Amino acid sequence: MYEEIRMKFTDIFIRRPVLAVSISLLMIILGLQAISKLAVREYPKMTTTVITVSTAYPGADANLIQAFVTSKLEESIAQADNIDYMSSTSAPSSSTITIKMKLNTDPAGALADVLAKVNAVKSALPNGIEDPSVSSSSGGSGIMYISFRSKKLDSSQVTDYINRVVKPQFFTIEGVAEVQVFGAAEYALRIWLDPQKMAAQNLSVPTVMSALSANNVQTAAGNDNGYYVSYRNKVETTTKSVEQLSNLIISSNGDDLVRLRDIATVELNKENDNSRATANGAESVVLAINPTSTANPLTVAEKIRPLYESIKTQLPDSMESDILYDRTIAINSSIHEVIKTIGEATLIVLVVILMFIGSFRAILIPILAIPISLIGVLMLLQSFNFSINLMTLLALILAIGLVVDDAIVVLENIDRHIKAGETPFRAAIIGTREIAVPVISMTIALIAVYSPMALMGGITGTLFKEFALTLAGAVFISGVVALTLSPMMSSKLLKSNAKPTWMEERVEHTLGKVNRVYEYMLDLVMLNRKSMLAFAVVIFSTLPFLFNSLSSELTPNEDKGAFIAIGNAPSSVNVDYIQNAMQPYMKNVMETPEVSFGMSIAGAPTSNSSLNIITLKDWKERSRKQSAIMNEINEKAKSIPEVSVSAFNIPEIDTGEQGPPVSIVLKTAQDYKSLANTAEKFLSAMKASGKFIYTNLDLTYDTAQMTISVDKEKAGTYGITMQQISNTLGSFLSGATVTRVDVDGRAYKVISQVKRDDRLSPESFQNYYLTASNGQSVPLSSVISMKLETQPTSLPRFSQLNSAEISAVPMPGISSGDAIAWLQQQATDNLPQGYTFDFKSEARQLVQEGNALAVTFALAVIIIFLVLAIQFESIRDPMVIMISVPLAVSGALVSLNILSFFSIAGTTLNIYSQVGLITLVGLITKHGILMCEVAKEEQLNHGKTRIEAITHAAKVRLRPILMTTAAMVAGLIPLLYATGAGAVSRFSIGIVIVAGLSIGTIFTLFVLPVVYSYVATEHKPLPVFDENKTTH
């Protein structure tokens, strides 16, 4: 009775065609309304938050900064929640602490938490520091780099225009977190003190500084309230111009006045000269626009472009501007390519189905499942607050081949009954009843496979949650269509006793031949079952080798139309050196025919390095891939001895990390000298390994430092205090901000310093004077002694331990996974006692993800096994079905290994290829379900043995298995020939599924029947239950 009711469920839709059509139309309508409401992104929303705490302490050395500023802040900040890691750099005059938050941490809450921790220790920080600046960003590279240059205006004037006119406009765009200015030469009122003239006037530094501060103050004078009129008071107590500041009286003795111009030169000039930028060889000022942690780069860039065009029209006649790099160009190109692939895959699937069916009328039945499923799933994306992104679009490509499977199986079964003499209506009723359970089982099995991906954490989980649920949603809808619309259409469109067309005859003839060949070969296999079983065992035994022989990486290297190059020079050099050293490199870059723009920023990200972004021409305008261009440029870079430089790919997934793809951090509580020696040995081993084309260590003792010792006894006899010495040296050398002035409505720093000629070498100290307690000038050199030492440029820390970071770019042919594995082994075997190691950049993400996908794969296998066990009420039958999984996986791995041998990009174990392997689990088990379900029914209803049942089932289900496999494989063919942005990732997942499904299907058709004959449950016909019979 239960069986009859269950099977009659599908009859409703055959008998009520309007109901079947209405259900499908409803899904299409809901899907169409969702299209305009879904956001378009590169990847699913992934919040990466990096908080930076910057503190300036002008004139202080790195050790002082670390002891009194960095360490105090670190201790407090470490108590904040959701920190992934914290690193810091203590450099002369500045402390920078970088806090990388865990993925998808609320950026506003994280910023507030860190800010509270900073404020808690501000009172414990030294006097003389500037207030710590706390900022939050996504941490990745800017989404857009824009250059500004002029043949008439100098860099200070260009920078001033950008700060006053351009930057404020970009900040009006929602989603812009930061606008960095590189090559900037910001204006400041520079006071170039003359130590000898000050000594001649008996003026001490405190006297000069006090006069400057006391005579430039902002006054809030309130209002005058009369009986009827109120007046606002404005008191001009600030300096408004260079002339006013120059005429400032520093001291007076009757008519003898000493003005600032008598002891110093005052001018409006550059605040500092820490970075230089060039664009295509021309000196420029470059803006980098960084989005907020939660912003959609595509939306932000879309708003920037019209604003930028408006800004260009406002530029002075002598100023020019270009967009040097736009990250969203590659994103939009990749999305466009994927959408195009969806169209191509649909056409190919249509042709393949036609080749198997041969009837234009019949082909409508499975083909309609494609638009209904693809459009219908959009309503699910909307309900889950998902977006249209590369992952959901990739899921739709895979779905094209999947969603027709169920409809094909239903169509084929109904068509078989029509050819057996049934009317289309009866064939639809009988055929759908027979196939309903396998269809539901296959749908549940596929959904079960993807569910573990939706439960994963980390980057992989964030990326593939939407992928998995999109694919599962499309499969669910296709199952609904297969059991509602497809049977109804079959009853209306298919004809009994109709004369076959020429194409139908050819198709039938060809498939008949295939069927007969398969039957013959299967019979041979079943006669030699032990040989086939041995073959299967051999295949299974090769799986560990096939896995281990593949390289691993987080994501394959893509041709993104742009790449980064980092140049490093010795720590002791200045910005002039690095700029000149990089000129030959950039000349080689610009002479490369595929290069469109070349940007070089000397002095970034550190004072002795250069950040370079090279933009290539459109993919259609060049024949060479990005990797080939980078390799050529890297080879030419080896001939430049002054600087170590290497190009590397922009990270495919923006995880808030910057720099080369591999960075290992050595940590210890020991002193920096010991750490530097250990790091140098580790670096030497890396260079000797031949696995890295570029390496750079951030802790080297090669920077000259003058250690000044004060004779406190002698200074005391003169009445000279340590505070006086500190203030004098600070005002002469550090370039500290004394006060600020208002010029044309904009605040500028007032910076005191001696001229460059008076600070070229330690000998300059002989011209510095202090004021003794009796008012006489005393040479500074008389109370100090100096010793030249070598020190690091900066003192880095990681997780509150002294650290040394080695950044590296693996050699071509060496994956980041292989490089990391070598580094882990090297560090484990060779680091001394008291040392540990960690990773940064892309390497950190790869290590953190670890075996997450392997666990997901195992979980998918377990879940689908349990689902099948429930369906078959057996443990052994699911084991037989699952035997096809290692067969398919071996096919995929063999293909990856062969292609990897020929250095084909994307043939590594990465998140895309591993997701392809997980997808294979669901696809290949469908074959086993189809065969085992028929075999089970044959045993229950016809009393056949296991061998007879599975042989019959394999022959009956050959055609739908071949059709569904061909449809799936054909739908993925465009991925194998993908070009342009994102092509390698699409190829990676495509080749795994195509190779695995094709080879796995061939193996399954022969191995599964053999295994079934040995392992499967013997299904006995159930006894008829008589409710009137009494048992004792």
Swiss-Prot record:
Subcellular location: Cell inner membrane
SUPFAM superfamilies, A to Z: Multidrug efflux transporter AcrB pore domain, PN1, PN2, PC1 and PC2 subdomains, Multidrug efflux transporter AcrB TolC docking domain, DN and DC subdomains, Multidrug efflux transporter AcrB transmembrane domain
Keywords: Cell inner membrane, Cell membrane, Membrane, Transmembrane, Transmembrane helix, Transport
Membrane protein topology class: Multi-pass membrane protein
GO CC term, one of those recorded: plasma membrane
Pfam families: ACR_tran
Any GO molecular function: xenobiotic transmembrane transporter activity
Domain of life of the organism encoding this protein: Bacteria
Topology, Periplasmic side: 37-337, 384-389, 458-470, 549-852, 899-910, 980-992
Family matches, as Gene3D superfamilies: Multidrug efflux transporter AcrB pore domain, Multidrug efflux transporter AcrB pore domain like, Multidrug efflux transporter AcrB TolC docking domain, DN and DC subdomains, Multidrug efflux transporter AcrB transmembrane domain
InterPro entries: AcrB_DN_DC_subdom (IPR027463), Acrflvin-R (IPR001036)
Family label: Belongs to the resistance-nodulation-cell division (RND) (TC 2.A.6) family.
Protein name: Uncharacterized transporter HI_0895
Species name: Haemophilus influenzae (strain ATCC 51907 / DSM 11121 / KW20 / Rd)
Top-level taxonomy: Bacteria, Pseudomonadati, Pseudomonadota, Gammaproteobacteria, Pasteurellales
